[in-house]
Amino acid sequence: MHTTLNRRSLLGIAGASMLVAAAAPVMGEPAGESPAPRLVTGNGEWTYEIVPEWGALPAGTQFGGTHGAIATDKAGRVYVSTQSETGVLVYDANGKLLKTIAHEYPEVHAIFYAEEGGDEIFYTVVQKGTPKENWLMVKMKTDGTVLQKITAPGEAGFKTPNEWRITSVVTGPDGSIFIANGYGDSRIFRFDKQGNYKASFTHKGSGDGECNCSHGLAVDTRYDQPLLLVCDRENYRLSHYDFDGKFVANITQHLRRPCQVSFHGDYAVVSELQGRATILDKDNVPVAFLGDNPQRSQWANYGLKPSEIPTAVFSAAHGCFIDSLANIYVSDWNQTGRITKLKRTTV
């Protein structure tokens, strides 16, 4: 379950990767008339083709930056959060914009999908909402109807509002709600399903059981015992905890600032802020690198114009989701907005 990425393993996979790059479309520009070249990334059974212009919007349309997450519902619709009053974009699998939801929450940073009592639910982290509603968890239906809100608990002992700067949310097997204070003190807070505070665990640091930006949370069901997976971004690693908050292990190290994780069977795809996405097997060994950007100056560079980023690479992979067909969706941290669909292919 535990692995450390060494230089030899990294170079081996990187050397096997296939990558063809070209200029990237800007969100909002119309699709070009000439056919796009076939652009691929990854290796072996994890080879992907970049879907040209996926999610492109009508000319002149601006939806704002992408500093958030991606999710799908049972019907296969794709939800992409933005940094604007447009809220969350809803696409079909082919990249056609169907509608937008959650307009009152212009900065949704995380989206966790769940089915509860026959209903499809999103647990979201909102960093900016109405003038009086910032940094809160909002549970909503997939049409944006709000069901529940959680704000900073009094038990946290915060002295100023700025200490509560949450980044991610998931629910545990018993319905408990876990919220990561990733941009704050890196603690992870546990609430019951009604939203009552129960406990917190971890604190800022680099040792076992500590985090330096608990940026992303996921429920890892690849093993006999489900575990809480934490993207410990500024420690460049993924860590496991049980749902009582007990540290289990650091499972993968030397990633490039992991932001979010999504699962497909025994495999996990990790978005990395330093220009890459990585696929890990059940032993948490990398089996493919996707969109690996060789230009370090573009890593974690929010201010880039999408036209400056080669189509088949990422600049700051932030949101990611892998669907039932193992297709992958990635949103870069980008001030204009950049979404990429990678379609799994065969070689």
Predicted features along the sequence, with ranges:
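N-terminal secretory signal peptides and thylakoid transit peptides that target proteins
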Residues: M1-M18
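Blade/loop signatures of beta-propeller domains
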Residues: A31-P52
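Beta-strand-rich domains and repeat architectures in extracellular enzymes and scaffolds
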Residues: P52-Q83
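Surface-exposed loop and turn segments in beta-propeller and other repeat-based domains
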Residues: P52-T61, L147-T160, W164, K198-G209, ...
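Beta-rich, blade/repeat-based domains predominating
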Residues: Q62-K74, Y105-G118, E155-S176, S206-L227, ...
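Conserved beta-propeller blade signature
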Residues: R77-Y79, I121-Y123, I177-F178, L227-L229, ...
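Blade-loop segments of beta-propeller domains
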Residues: G87, A93-D119, V126-Q127
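Blade-level signature of beta-propeller repeat domains, shared across WD40, Kelch, NHL, RCC1
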Residues: A316-V347
